[in-house]
Structure formats: C-alpha cells, structure tokens
Amino acid sequence: MLNFEYCNPVNVVFGKGQIAKLAELVPQDAKVMMTYGGGSIKRNGVYEQVMDALQGRKVIEFGGIEPNPKYETCMKAVEICKAEGIDFLLAVGGGSTLDGTKFIAAAAKYPEGQDPWDICLKGAPVLDEIPIGCVI
C-alpha cells in the first residue's frame, strides 16, 4: 500500500429527510440558483422539499439541463447568474445536472473577455467559482 494523505473538505449529509438540512447549510442571505433537469424533481416531491428548506432566500430556478449538458444551455445559466448576482448554486437531480452546474459555477466567475469553454477544451485553470451544493 502506498502512503498518502487525503483531504476532502466536503460536507456530505445522507439519509431520509436530510433535504431539510439545506435550511442550515445554505447561507440565509444567499441568492440561490437551483438547477435541475427535465422536471422529475417536481413529480417526485423533491422540489417541494428543497423549496421548503430554502424559505427566506431568493431562489431562481434554471431547469432543462439535458443529459450531457450542452455548452449553450449552461451559458444561459451563466448569464442569469451574472445578471442576478447569484452567489450560491444548488444542483438538484443527477449526474448531468451536477456536471452542468459545476461548469456554470466556474464559467460565471471566468475572466471577462475570455471563453469559459477553455476550461473544458484546454484545461484552463479555474481560479474562482460560485459555491455549490447538491441534492442527488
């Protein structure tokens, strides 16, 4: 076995009824963009649980993140983040929603005049990002 150190400063909350913990974990004064995919969260009850937990916060919804998110879709969310002063992203859904939201977080803080696509295409460094939470 190799010697190594691993530091992963991520708070993971797991289990039944844990969505309510968002009330404690998302800053009270946050301007939140909630991202999701095709709308299953509205059919399975997760949407209501998330919105209940986020009461008192400004929440802007961005739905329609498709499987294997398209750059154009994510960039629409980036523009909203910039226009609305979003300072917290909450991805609600599966892997594609989380992947798209991670890109949105980095692209929204990418230097003006530069193309955020370089993060994916050229491996450009991410120097700043909007904080992210996720409900999977």
Task: Write out the residue ranges for each language-model feature.
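Glycine/threonine-rich beta-strand-loop-alpha-helix active-site module
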Residues: 72-136
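ATP/NTP phosphate-donor binding region
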Residues: 1-88
